[in-house]
C-alpha cells in the first residue's frame, strides 16, 4: 500500500482535489484547444461571464457514437491482448513475494491496431476524423465510464482479490485513489493494468496522433511539417514503448502502484486527453517550420527517445544477466542490496551505479521530458497551453523520482544510503 508522507489532512485534501478537478480539466483543455483557439485568456473570459453554468453548458454529453467508438476500440484491444501470441515474461518479485507472469504481445497488438485503423480509413470503411469530431463526447464518456470502472476495481479488491498483493488501509478515499490490488486480473490470463496502462492508454496515444494528422489533412488538404514532426515523434515514442513493454512491467506503474484512480483513471482518461494534447492543438494551428528546422527538431527528438530507451535497456540487460554484462564497454559497478518482503523472506537486488545510472538515480527522466518538448515545440510559442503536457510531465516525473527514492530508502535501508553516496544526484547530473 502506498505510504503517505504528509499529514492526513493534506493527503486527503490533495486526493479529493485531484478526484474533483482532473475530470473538468480534461473538458476545459479540449474546449480551449478546439473551441477557444487554444487561448486560456478567451476561456477565462468565457467563465468570467458565465460562471459555473458555463462549465455545465460546454460539457459534452456522452453520445451513442462516443460509446460505440470506446467500446469497439476497447473490445478490439482486449481481444488482441488475449489472442495474439507472445513470449512468456516474468515480472519482478512483488512485496508479498509473488512473481506475476505476462504475455508479451504488445508490439504485435500495436502494429495490428495501426494497420487496422489506417486500413479502415484507406478503404473508406471508417473516417478517423469522426473521432476528432466527437472528441469532447468521447472524453466525457471516458471520464464517467472510467470512474465507474475504478469503483468496480475497488469492490473487486474487497471481495475477489487476484493475489495476496492486495488489501485495504482502512480508509475509503486512499483505497479508491491508490487502489486495492497490485495485480488485478480477470481469470488467470487477463491482466487489468496491462490493459488500462498499455493496451488502452498508450495505444490510444498512437491512435489519436494519427487521428489528428488525418483531421488536419481533411481541413487543409495537406499536413503541415509541424504536425508531421509531432506525429512522427509521438509514434516513435509509442513504438519504443511497446518494443520495451516487458521492461515497463518492472517499473513503478506496474510493480509498485496499485490499480486505483491514480493509475487506471489516469491511463484511461488522462493519457488520451492530456498526453496527446500537442497534436490536438496543431489540428487547428498548423505551423510551417521549414525543412531545415523540422529536420533539426525531428533528429533531436529521436535522439532523446533513443537515449531514454537505452537507459531502460541498459538497466533491463543488467538485471536480466544478474550484472554479468558490459555497461559502456566495461564491467558494471553495482551494489548488492538485501531486503525483506512482507511475508518475511529475505531477497537480494542489484543496484546499478554505472552507465546512464551512474549519472543520476533517475537520469532517464531527462530525455523523457526533452522528448515531450521536441514533439511540442513544432507548435512554437503562440499559446502556452500546447506545453501543458511538458509541464505536467516534468512535475509528474520529479514527484515520481521522490516517491521512488522514498520507497527504495524504506525497502533497502543502509544499502540505499550507500547507493545515494555513489550516485549523488536524483535526476539532473550536477544540479538535482
Swiss-Prot record:
GO molecular function: 7-dehydrocholesterol reductase activity
Catalytic activity: cholesterol + NADP(+) = 7-dehydrocholesterol + NADPH + H(+)
Keyword Protease carried by entry: no
Membrane topology designation: Multi-pass membrane protein
E.C. numbers: 1.3.1.21
Outcome reported for the amino acid change (mutating residue 257 to N): In DWF5-4; dwarf plant
Transmembrane domains' residue ranges: 12-34, 64-86, 107-126, 136-155, 195-212, 227-249, 261-283, 287-309, 371-393
Alphabetized Gene3D superfamilies for the sequence: 1.20.120.1630
Cellular localisation: Endoplasmic reticulum membrane
Signal peptide: none
Keywords, comma-separated and alphabetical: Cholesterol biosynthesis, Cholesterol metabolism, Endoplasmic reticulum, Lipid biosynthesis, Lipid metabolism, Membrane, NADP, Oxidoreductase, Steroid biosynthesis, Steroid metabolism, Sterol biosynthesis, Sterol metabolism, Transmembrane, Transmembrane helix
Key word Cytoplasm present: no
Disulfide-linked positions: none
GO annotation, cellular component aspect: endoplasmic reticulum membrane; Golgi apparatus; nucleus
Pathway participation: Lipid metabolism; steroid biosynthesis
Name of this chain's protein: 7-dehydrocholesterol reductase
Amino acid at each position: 500500500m502506498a505510504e503517505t508522507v504528509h499529514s492526513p489532512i493534506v493527503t486527503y485534501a490533495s486526493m479529493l482535489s485531484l478526484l474533483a478537478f482532473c475530470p473538468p480539466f480534461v473538458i476545459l483543455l479540449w474546449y480551449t484547444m478546439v473551441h477557444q483557439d487554444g487561448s486560456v485568456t478567451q476561456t477565462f473570459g468565457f467563465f468570467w461571464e458565465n460562471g459555473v453554468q458555463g462549465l455545465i453548458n460546454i460539457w459534452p454529453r456522452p453520445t451513442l457514437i462516443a460509446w460505440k467508438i470506446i467500446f469497439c476500440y476497447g473490445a478490439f484491444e482486449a481481444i488482441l491482448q488475449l489472442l495474439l501470441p507472445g513470449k512468456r515474461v516474468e515480472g519482478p518479485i512483488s512485496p508479498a513475494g509473488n512473481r506475476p507472469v505476462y504475455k508479451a504481445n504488445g508490439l504485435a497488438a500495436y502494429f495490428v491496431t495501426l494497420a487496422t485503423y489506417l486500413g479502415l480509413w484507406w478503404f473508406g470503411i471508417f473516417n478517423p476524423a469522426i473521432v476528432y469530431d466527437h472528441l469532447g463526447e468521447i472524453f466525457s464518456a471516458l471520464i464517467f465510464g472510467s470512474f465507474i470502472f475504478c469503483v468496480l476495481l475497488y469492490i473487486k479488491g474487497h471481495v475477489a482479490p487476484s493475489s495476496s498483493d492486495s488489501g485495504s488501509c482502512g480508509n475509503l478515499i486512499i483505497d479508491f485513489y491508490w487502489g486495492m490490488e497490485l495485480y488485478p486480473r480477470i481469470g488467470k490470463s487477463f491482466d487489468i493494468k496491462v490493459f488500462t496502462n498499455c493496451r488502452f492508454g498508450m495505444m490510444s496515444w498512437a491512435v489519436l496522433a494519427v487521428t489528428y494528422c488525418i483531421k488536419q489533412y481533411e481541413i487543409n488538404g495537406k499536413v503541415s511539417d509541424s504536425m508531421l514532426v509531432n506525429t512522427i515523434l509521438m509514434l516513435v515514442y509509442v513504438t519504443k514503448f511497446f518494443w520495451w513493454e516487458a521492461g515497463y512491467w518492472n517499473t513503478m506503474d506496474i510493480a509498485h502502484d496499485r490499480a486505483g484512480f491514480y493509475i487506471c483513471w489516469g491511463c484511461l482518461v488522462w493519457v488520451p486527453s492530456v498526453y496527446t494534447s500537442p497534436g490536438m492543438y496543431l489540428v487547428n494551428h498548423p505551423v510551417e517550420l521549414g525543412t531545415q528546422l523540422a529536420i533539426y527538431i525531428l533528429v533531436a527528438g529521436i535522439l532523446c527517445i533513443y537515449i531514454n530507451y537505452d537507459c531502460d535497456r541498459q538497466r533491463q540487460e543488467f538485471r536480466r544477466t544478474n550484472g554479468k554484462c558490459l555497461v559502456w564497454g566495461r564491467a558494471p559497478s553495482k551494489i548488492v542490496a538485501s531486503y525483506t518482503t512482507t511475508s518475511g523472506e529475505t531477497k537480494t537486488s542489484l543496484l546499478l551505479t554505472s552507465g546512464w545510472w551512474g549519472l543520476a538515480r533517475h537520469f532517464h527522466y531527462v530525455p523523457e521530458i526533452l522528448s515531450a518538448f521536441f514533439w511540442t515545440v513544432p507548435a512554437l510559442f503562440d499559446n502556452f497551453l500546447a506545453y501543458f503536457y511538458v509541464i505536467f510531465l516534468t512535475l509528474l516525473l520529479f514527484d515520481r523520482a521522490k516517491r521512488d527514492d522514498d520507497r527504495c530508502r524504506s525497502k533497502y535501508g543502509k544499502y540505499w544510503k550507500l547507493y545515494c553516496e555513489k550516485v549523488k544526484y536524483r535526476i539532473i547530473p550536477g544540479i538535482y
